[in-house]
Amino acid sequence: NRVQVETSDYTEAGLSALAARLMSAQTNVTRLVVCNGVLQGAGYRPERALAQIDSAAMNEVFEVNTFLPMRVLSAMAPLLKTSAAPIVAALSARVGSLGDNRRGGWYSYRSSKAALNMMLQCLAHELVRVNPSAKVVAYHPGTVDTPLSKPFQAAVSPEALLQSDQAAEALDSVLSQVVADGTLSYVDWRGQTIPW
């Protein structure tokens, strides 16, 4: 297996330069995983009630969780159209599921991940028309021991808290098992389907 890690800033110019570099190297993308997300930031936390919604905070959450992944995928679209059997995954979250929302709250985070899922669905429809061997995955990594989950880990049982290496192995395992069927899969780290 050969892994090529690429980094870029999230500007359109930076992403375009990365895509051009990969295109000129005739890179065949087998897996493209967009791994970014934010739940809280400077001066804001996940909303527990409608009255806590702050437009600036919500815009930041949507920028990171929804718009940035799509900006990456938009820049990489030419590669995805020409690569043999590319698997495209973006980190979603179970809390972005309408069918699995039993608690409410976390308005910005939940809705940003639900919006990401819809955009990934649109991408799956677009890609299948030009590259039927492509697959798109909205991936819920579980609760991973990262700065994003730190403030909320007290509510997570120790056996349910994944370490980064476990999360990476689970992602690899799930992506190794997906089938290019022209649809978007919404799955968790165990490979189980999440309801929309």
Kindly label every feature range from the protein language model.
Residues 38-42, 46-70, 81-130:
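Catalytic loop of short-chain dehydrogenase/reductase
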Residues 21-36, 41:
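A glycine-rich helix->loop->beta "capping" turn
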Residues 2-15:
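Rossmann-fold cofactor-recognition segment
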Residues 12-19, 149:
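A conserved hydrophobic alpha-helix of the Rossmann-fold in NAD(P)-dependent oxidoreductases
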Residues 138, 146, 150, 154-196:
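C-terminal helical subdomain
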Residues 19, 73, 120, 168-171:
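Short-chain dehydrogenase/reductase
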